[in-house]
Amino acid sequence: MSGTEEAILGGRDSHPAAGGGSVLCFGQCQYTAEEYQAIQKALRQRLGPEYISSRMAGGGQKVCYIEGHRVINLANEMFGYNGWAHSITQQNVDFVDLNNGKFYVGVCAFVRVQLKDGSYHEDVGYGVSEGLKSKALSLEKARKEAVTDGLKRALRSFGNALGNCILDKDYLRSLNKLPRQLPLEVDLTKAKRQDLEPSVEEARYNSCRPNMALGHPQLQQVTSPSRPSHAVIPADQDCSSRSLSSSAVESEATHQRKLRQKQLQQQFRERMEKQQVRVSTPSAEKSEAAPPAPPVTHSTPVTVSEPLLEKDFLAGVTQELIKTLEDNSEKWAVTPDAGDGVVKPSSRADPAQTSDTLALNNQMVTQNRTPHSVCHQKPQAKSGSWDLQTYSADQRTTGNWESHRKSQDMKKRKYDPS
């Protein structure tokens, strides 16, 4: 069965795009005149004996056929890997019989082969499985055989190059007279040994670049980071640009999506770096504003004001002693009327007082010359010793003045007969 779909079943394979036009799907791309003539010429050729196989059918009859992988390779060469497609429109299980523990299954399948311009051919295939003990394996074998048979029958409708020449009996008889060529040796150096194909990827990417430069498949990305980026392809009026493969568009969309993800990651890193700089700036200002603490060493004195306090204390004690001595001298000073033999304390100093004062001054000088380390080690004990020394000096001075007063009283009694 053959035919050409009108509007591809009412336009079911087309859908409106965001730009207001329609995006061409498979089955709507037209062949150019040059491409049409080249395909038509190739389909008229008949297959050689290298493509045709034979087997014995029921009743001892010899049957010629084309293997499934060969017919698929021929279709790819004629139409291109993305220029044709096949689909199973219907599949029926005719019977499933169990006989002596073995299954017998028959399945029929309707297969349609469609080209990129919308033309298609459809045919029926049949598959049989006999004598298997597993029901599942029997159904699998019958279904696959039915689909393969229907595919070969549908492709055969396109021309001699896809198997239609096998039905010509005269051609097969003449074909048997031709000497069969020896099979070519397999060249393992050209075998595929790795998954990556750099030449194919580079060619696919380069084919997309001119179209993007001309503005035909402009990809519009969504700028919102919360939604995944997607590409919108506007409609194109040029028919030649409509033949761009869907795989190339998908690869370009994937490339743009990866670029967008990299941009979002870079923006996130920049924001995080700015936040870290903002957090580190106040801490740095606080550290600069705070005065640096002096380094603590073992030679640094514990209290710096102790020597100054000690000097002030010594100066105050000295002034108090001098003032006390002056008050005592004024108190016990004798007027000139008392007689010539009276000794005036204010006129000359007492030997005991002079010696005590000199001893106190020497002790103060010695204390001032004492190293600071000793003062820092025992400040409390030193202040206590100075208080004791001052108290003893006052006691000696007071005792000397009392003895001097007694001697003056004795002299007064001698000079005064009454």
Swiss-Prot record:
InterPro entries: DNA_recomb/repair_Rad52, Rad52_fam, Rad52_Rad59_Rad22, Rad52_Rad59_Rad22_sf. Changing residue 152 to A: Abolishes ssDNA-binding. It is found in: Nucleus. The modification Phosphothreonine is found at residues 318, 335. One of its GO terms (molecular function) is single-stranded DNA binding. One of its GO terms (biological process) is regulation of nucleotide-excision repair. Gene3D superfamilies: DNA repair protein Rad52/59/22. Residues 240-251 have a biased composition (Low complexity). Involved in double-stranded break repair. Plays a central role in genetic recombination and DNA repair by promoting the annealing of complementary single-stranded DNA and by stimulation of the RAD51 recombinase. This is DNA repair protein RAD52 homolog. The gene is RAD52.
